[in-house]
């Protein structure tokens, strides 16, 4: 594991909040919490897409409409940045034009940003919450942690126990995402639960124990271990079980284990990560990886001893 890379993503010097301005109410509390935890500077970025200028309101003077939109966005972000600085949080803002995904990725490269916070607020024809196209493309293509936040997010009460849920897949090497989750929990003095969901396979009674053993083995590789994680193994459909666990335990953060990044939106939308992000009520970190784990002779991924069963323990 590259320790320099790990340190950069777990303790970033700057955090980028990519906002459409309508989502600031639920993005800012998350950004503030993470900035306080890491000491990072907050960047606020709004990108005005080309279609924003093609409207009835722009009429015969599209240039005037462009400048009005730009100045208005600048004023909003400047006011927010000032408020954060008055709260002793380092913050700066910028407004750009053209295509949001390209501009956000360009900004990340230019400023060496190691963490992105973005909203997920698109809705389908039946009103079902989906991941907006900008957030979806960023999740699929970036190699830094992306924290997605939905409009249903509510800041937890101050006296509420701080919990982090790490949903681990053993199909892909989860080492750096596991360490990321452990470091998040240690930095915020949070209770960490590691959840592995195995699809039903009634013929292998030792597989739940095998998954537990594999997770414990991964944890032993982390030094120093500053938290004592709880380990849970459940059976069922992975996305459904992860969402159910979030609803039951109400974590402040969800970390999804490394999943294979795909340039194809159809492939991503069919996967566990997309369905979980679109449904859970808490901010969710994703850390993509294209590296698959080799099959083990004693443990086969995504199967368990008994349908509907769960196993738990503490490391």
Where are the predicted features?
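Small/aliphatic-rich secondary-structure junction motif
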Residues: 2-62, 162-207, 220-230, 251, ...
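Charged docking surfaces used in two-component/phosphorelay signaling
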Residues: 95-103, 234-241
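Extended, non-globular alpha-helical segments
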Residues: 1-7, 134-153, 211
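Short beta-strand elements of ligand-binding domains
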Residues: 118-120, 145-152, 257, 284-288
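Rossmann-fold cofactor-recognition segment
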Residues: 90-94, 228-231
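Glycine-rich phosphate-binding loop signature in dinucleotide/nucleotide-binding domains
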Residues: 107-113, 247-251
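Glycine-rich, Arg-bearing micro-motifs that act as flexible, cationic patches
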Residues: 115-137, 253-279, 293-297
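A short acidic, glycine-rich active-site loop
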Residues: 62-75
């Amino acid at each position: 594991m590259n320790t320099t890379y790990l340190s950069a993503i777990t303790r970033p010097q700057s955090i980028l909040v990519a906002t459409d301005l309508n989502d600031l109410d639920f993005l800012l509390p998350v950004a503030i919490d993470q900035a306080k935890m890491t000491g990072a500077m907050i960047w606020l970025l709004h990108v005005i897409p080309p279609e924003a200028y093609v409207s009835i309101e722009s009429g015969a003077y599209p240039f005037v409409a462009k400048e009005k939109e730009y100045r208005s966005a600048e004023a909003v972000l400047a006011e927010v940045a000032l408020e954060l600085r008055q709260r002793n949080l380092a913050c700066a803002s910028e407004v750009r034009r053209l295509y949001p995904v390209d501009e956000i990725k360009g900004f990340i490269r230019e400023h060496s940003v190691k963490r992105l916070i973005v909203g997920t607020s698109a809705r389908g024809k039946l009103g079902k919450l989906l991941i907006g196209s900008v957030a979806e493309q960023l999740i699929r293509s970036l190699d830094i942690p992306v924290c997605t936040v939905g409009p249903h997010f509510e800041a937890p009460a101050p006296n509420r126990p701080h919990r982090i849920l790490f949903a681990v897949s053993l199909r892909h090497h989860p080492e750096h995402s596991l360490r990321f989750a452990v470091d998040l929990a240690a930095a915020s003095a949070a209770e960490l639960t590691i959840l592995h969901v195995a699809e039903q396979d009634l013929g292998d009674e030792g597989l739940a124990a095998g998954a537990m053993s594999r997770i414990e083995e991964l944890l032993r590789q982390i030094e120093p271990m500053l938290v004592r994680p709880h380990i849970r193994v459940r059976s069922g459909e992975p996305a459904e079980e992860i969402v159910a666990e979030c609803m039951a335990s109400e974590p402040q953060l969800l970390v999804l284990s490394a999943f294979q990044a795909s340039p194809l939106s159809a492939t991503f939308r069919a996967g566990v990560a997309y369905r979980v992000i679109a449904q859970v009520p808490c901010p969710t970190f994703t850390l993509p990886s294209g590296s698959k784990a080799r099959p083990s002779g004693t443990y086969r991924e995504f199967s368990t001893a008994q349908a509907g069963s769960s196993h738990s323990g503490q490391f």
